[in-house]
Structure formats: structure tokens, C-alpha cells
Amino acid sequence: MASQLTDAFARKFYYLRLSITDVCNFRCTYCLPDGYKPSGVTNKGFLTVDEIRRVTRAFASLGTEKVRLTGGEPSLRRDFTDIIAAVRENDAIRQIAVTTNGYRLERDVANWRDAGLTGINVSVDSLDARQFHAITGQDKFNQVMAGIDAAFEAGFEKVKVNTVLMRDVNHHQLDTFLNWIQHRPIQLRFIELMETGEGSELFRKHHISGQVLRDELLRRGWIHQLRQRSDGPAQVFCHPDYAGEIGLIMPYEKDFCATCNRLRVSSIGKLHLCLFGEGGVNLRDLLEDDTQQQALEARISAALREKKQTHFLHQNNTGITQNLSYIGG
């Protein structure tokens, strides 16, 4: 289906990132170093399964092909499997993925796959168990590794792993990561540390450009692959000697926003046109009944006309994003 979601800069949007909670049980240094603190949840709480069904149906009608369930930690929701199944009901949604810290993967991933999940991203910022504990505040490294193995055993052909690139923390561990993916079909995605409202000091201390890794990968014979229209923002590299791939997400690179293809809805039903944008468009009042779908689609389409050409991270403007758990990164 051709996307009806096209902005003023001719960008087409096939990809919805849907946050279903902002609660997380990890305390990652770059996201929630002091742990989760409730904020911004209305009296209605987080989106219900029925509301999720309605909002994804509207986006699918407008051309969305891929939905990623994010958080917080999505698997903290007891109805998470039901949420996957609700999104899966719509045949227009070809891909349903989750971004998770992985602590419930080993237990639940087979059920998620049976419900309709097609893709998994797991956050792993270090392959050293002690450093993993220091970064996340949780001694769960072995549990997360077992969860990744369980995903393969459940039938997932590829698992994506997200690694936030941090100077003097993990930027010098490329060889360790490459050894890990040599015989595993893992797409390891290094994500540049992004400045958020609460993370300015950490950013100044640990930010390093992904260009450093890209230059090294090219020097070693890795090959840049072409993007598909519903792919995320990663530049993906492959190598004939490796079963795995490397992805680089570099939001500070020139023209990063030119290929933007994704919109975000928060766990309380606000449409966000950019991770680092201002405000948000309330959709929740149009999620109460199936008869509101036409009005919901109209509001989404109208909001898209206001999407800016680029973020303003280079001007140190992080918008409303105080931390990355707020609207799902």
C-alpha cells in the first residue's frame, strides 16, 4: 500500500513506534540513572488493548506497514502478549517488533512469536557482565544472553541488538562485539549517545561520533547495504566472513532526518512527530470507539503537515525529551 502519510518534505511514513508504557525496571546510566519515576500518566493510565487496536488500525489504513512496540520496558505489561495479538489482527501490518531490555525474553519469547511478533531488538551495552551491571543497574547479563538464545530457538531468524555507543565505556570494544556476531545472525546496532534534557552532562562526557566506527568498518572490508522503505534509521554493514551485521545510528550526521519514515505515539496516546520535537497531538479522545476511526485518521494526517524538516539537536535543543523512556526512544 502506498503511504497516505506524506509530509511537506515528501517524506513517506510507513513505520509507527508505539510506546505502551514508560515504566522500566532497569536504571541505565544514559536513560533512567535514578530509576523510574512516574510522570505524565493520566487518570486513564496507559493505552488499553482496545485503544492500541484502534490507533494501529488507523495508522495501517493510512499506509503504515511496521509497528514497533516500545517503552519503558514493554514486557512489564501483563497484557503484552494480548497487545501483540491485537496489532497482528490487521493484515496491513507486515512487521510487528519490540524493543526490550530482554529480561523476560527467555520466559516469554515463544509466546510472543505465537501471538504474531516478527522482530526483536534487545538492549545490550556491554558483553562484560560486570560492566553490563554497572550500566543498567541490574545483574541480568546472563539472563539477557539466555533470552537472545531463546529467541533463536523460538524461530526468529535474526535478532537486533542495540548498543549505545559511549566514549571510554564501550567504544573501544569493537573486536569483542565483532567476535560475538561472527557466527550469530545478530544485527548489532551502535547508537550514538543522544543528548536529552536530563542527560547533558553524560552527553558531554561520553558522546563519540559513530563515524569513528564507520571508518574502521570500511577499513576492514565491511560493505554498506541499501535501506528498505520501512527500515529504521540504521546504516547497515555486512561482511562475507560474518553471519551478523553492524548497524550505525548517527542522529548528529548531516541529512539524518532526510530519510525519516517513522512517527511515534506515546503510552498515553499523544502523537509525536519527532523524538526531539515539542508538545504532541492528543489522539486519545478519538480512541474511545470504533466509529471514530475516520476522525482519528484525519487528525493524524493534519498533524503531519506540521512536521519539521529536521531535529535541532545541533543547537542543543532536545525538545520535550527529558529521557528516552518518555516516548520510547
Curated annotation (Swiss-Prot):
Binding, GTP: 17, 68, 99, 160, 262-264
Q: Which residues bind [4Fe-4S] cluster 2?
A: 257, 260, 274
Q: Which residues bind [4Fe-4S] cluster 1?
A: 24, 28, 31
Q: Which GO terms describe its molecular function?
A: 4 iron, 4 sulfur cluster binding; cyclic pyranopterin monophosphate synthase activity; GTP 3',8'-cyclase activity; GTP binding; metal ion binding; S-adenosyl-L-methionine binding
Q: Could you confirm whether the keyword S-adenosyl-L-methionine appears in this record?
A: yes
State the reactions this protein catalyses: GTP + AH2 + S-adenosyl-L-methionine = (8S)-3',8-cyclo-7,8-dihydroguanosine 5'-triphosphate + 5'-deoxyadenosine + L-methionine + A + H(+)
Q: Which residues form a coiled coil?
A: none
Keywords assigned by UniProt, alphabetized: 4Fe-4S, GTP-binding, Iron, Iron-sulfur, Lyase, Metal-binding, Molybdenum cofactor biosynthesis, Nucleotide-binding, S-adenosyl-L-methionine
* Binding site residues for S-adenosyl-L-methionine: 30, 72, 123, 194
Q: Which family does it belong to?
A: Belongs to the radical SAM superfamily. MoaA family.
| Protein name, per record | GTP 3',8-cyclase
Organism (species): Escherichia coli O139:H28 (strain E24377A / ETEC)
